[in-house]
């Protein structure tokens, strides 16, 4: 049972509304023209006009995404995937790997080229292996610039890896005591759970890479694939996907997790969150209970998430109803915004409403 609420001071409140304000008026992609344009709520991560989420209106920029992932991976064993920002006071940025494919098109005398840019590609692999990996992902989720797949990736970066799950300055009203709890929480998951999947041929996970490139078996070679310790494996060995239990062909890339150990592998399309079953964006995962999780659901499995502001709750004093939780100050009606602590309320499809607003929604 939650304790009696105390008066909360503003505490640590550094989050800038600059991005929200600059997106003011942006139409909602979900409402298809019925929304008058993005109107930021003062503390919910939604539009006041249509109640849809921020990511239904706008997405963070490439630079913001790369800074966010750089911050996530810094101070972890994956910091080699980041680079220091010159004059950035120790800030690190994600060294996102892109892949550009250029194919000539035969059209008359002047040659033309068809160029495809993947906004993200697995690091440390040859272009051939990277392309094989992409072909094993559903086409609508391939992060090709200007396509639905690129939009899907950027949306998942916002949803699976919320900036306010790792950066206290992006949380609203943290008390000093909560700030310390959050800092320890982040430090612990970076040390014990955070991981980045590795793409390799079956049996080659964990092997050293030459100049950052994954080694490939020569065309037509019949040699056995090396094991993780560098010795030659049994050429007749079957490699099985950890999720679907299907066979992984020896010439087809798989995903490895060093948290799981290199005896386990996943088909590229099977490396998904154990909770929501969505592909793990940029292969970033959190290891828990013998499976990879996305950042959002990993954090929620350890601490409650406020159904009002979407931030993790780092206080022991909060409101819980069934499997939902709220900061006490956010236990308010989603319709009229009145405080509902000690008052009648109704929860319908995850929405917290006062009786009056609930009745008006039904009529």
From Swiss-Prot:
Q: Where in the cell is it found?
A: Cytoplasm; Nucleus
Tissue localization of expression: Highly expressed in both skeletal muscle and cardiac muscle.
Report the residue ranges that make up the LIM zinc-binding domain in this protein. 239-304, 305-363
The family database entries (CDD domains) matched by this protein are listed as: LIM1_Testin_like, PET_testin
Q: Bias regions of kind Basic and acidic residues — which residues?
A: 208-220
Q: Which residues carry this modification: Phosphoserine?
A: 16
**Residues in domain PET?**
99-206
Please indicate if the UniProt record lists Metal-binding as a keyword. yes
Described by its record, this protein's role is as follows:
Transcriptional cofactor that restricts GATA6 function by inhibiting DNA-binding, resulting in repression of GATA6 transcriptional activation of downstream target genes. Represses GATA6-mediated trans activation of lung- and cardiac tissue-specific promoters. Inhibits DNA-binding by GATA4 and GATA1 to the cTNC promoter. Plays a critical role in the development of cardiac hypertrophy via activation of calcineurin/nuclear factor of activated T-cells signaling pathway.
One GO location term (cellular component)? nucleus
Classify the source by domain of life: Eukaryota
Main location per the UniProt record: cytoplasm
Q: Which GO terms describe its molecular function?
A: transcription corepressor activity; zinc ion binding
Arranged from A to Z, the UniProt key words for this protein are:
Cytoplasm, LIM domain, Metal-binding, Nucleus, Phosphoprotein, Repeat, Repressor, Transcription, Transcription regulation, Zinc
Quick check: keyword Kinase in the entry? no
GO BP, sorted A to Z: positive regulation of calcineurin-NFAT signaling cascade; regulation of cardiac muscle hypertrophy
Designated name of the protein: LIM and cysteine-rich domains protein 1
Question: Sorted alphabetically, which PANTHER family does this protein's record hold?
Answer: LIM AND CYSTEINE-RICH DOMAINS PROTEIN 1 (PTHR24211:SF0), LIM DOMAIN-CONTAINING PROTEIN (PTHR24211)
- Identify the InterPro entries for this entry: PET_domain, PET_testin, Pk/Esn/Tes, Znf_LIM
Q: Where is this region: Disordered?
A: 200-233
This protein's species is: Sus scrofa
């Amino acid at each position: 049972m939650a304790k009696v609420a105390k008066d909360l001071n503003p505490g640590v409140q550094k989050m800038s509304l600059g991005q929200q304000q600059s997106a003011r008026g942006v139409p909602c992609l979900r409402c298809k023209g019925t929304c008058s344009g993005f109107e930021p709520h003062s503390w919910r991560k939604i539009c006041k006009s249509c109640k849809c989420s921020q990511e239904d209106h706008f997405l963070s920029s490439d630079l913001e995404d790369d800074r966010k992932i750089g911050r996530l991976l810094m101070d972890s064993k994956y910091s080699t995937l980041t680079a220091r920002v010159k004059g950035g006071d120790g800030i690190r940025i994600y060294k996102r790997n892109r892949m550009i494919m250029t194919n000539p098109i035969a059209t008359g005398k002047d040659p033309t080229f068809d160029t495809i840019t993947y906004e993200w590609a697995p690091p440390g692999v040859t272009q051939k292996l990277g392309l094989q990996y992409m072909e094993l992902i559903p086409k609508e989720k391939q992060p090709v610039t200007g396509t639905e797949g690129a939009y899907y990736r950027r949306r998942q970066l916002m949803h699976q890896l919320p900036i306010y799950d790792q950066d206290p300055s992006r949380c609203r009203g943290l008390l000093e005591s909560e700030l310390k709890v959050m800092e320890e929480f982040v430090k612990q998951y970076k040390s014990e759970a955070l991981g980045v999947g590795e793409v390799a041929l079956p049996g080659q996970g964990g092997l050293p890479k030459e100049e950052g490139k994954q080694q490939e078996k020569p065309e037509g070679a019949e040699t056995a694939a090396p094991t993780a310790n560098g010795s030659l494996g049994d050429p007749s060995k079957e490699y099985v996907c950890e999720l679907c239990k299907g066979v992984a062909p020896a010439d087809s890339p798989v995903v490895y997790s060093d948290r799981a150990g290199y005896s386990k592998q996943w088909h590229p399309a099977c490396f998904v969150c154990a909770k929501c079953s969505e592909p793990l964006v940029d292969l970033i995962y959190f290891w828990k209970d013998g499976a990879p999780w996305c950042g959002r659901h990993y954090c929620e499995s350890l601490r409650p998430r406020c159904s009002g502001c979407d931030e993790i709750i780092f206080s022991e004093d909060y409101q819980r109803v069934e499997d939902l939780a709220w900061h006490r100050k956010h236990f308010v009606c989603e319709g009229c915004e009145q405080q509902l602590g000690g008052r009648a309320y109704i929860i319908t499809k995850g929405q917290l409403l006062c009786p009056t607003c609930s009745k008006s929604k039904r009529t």
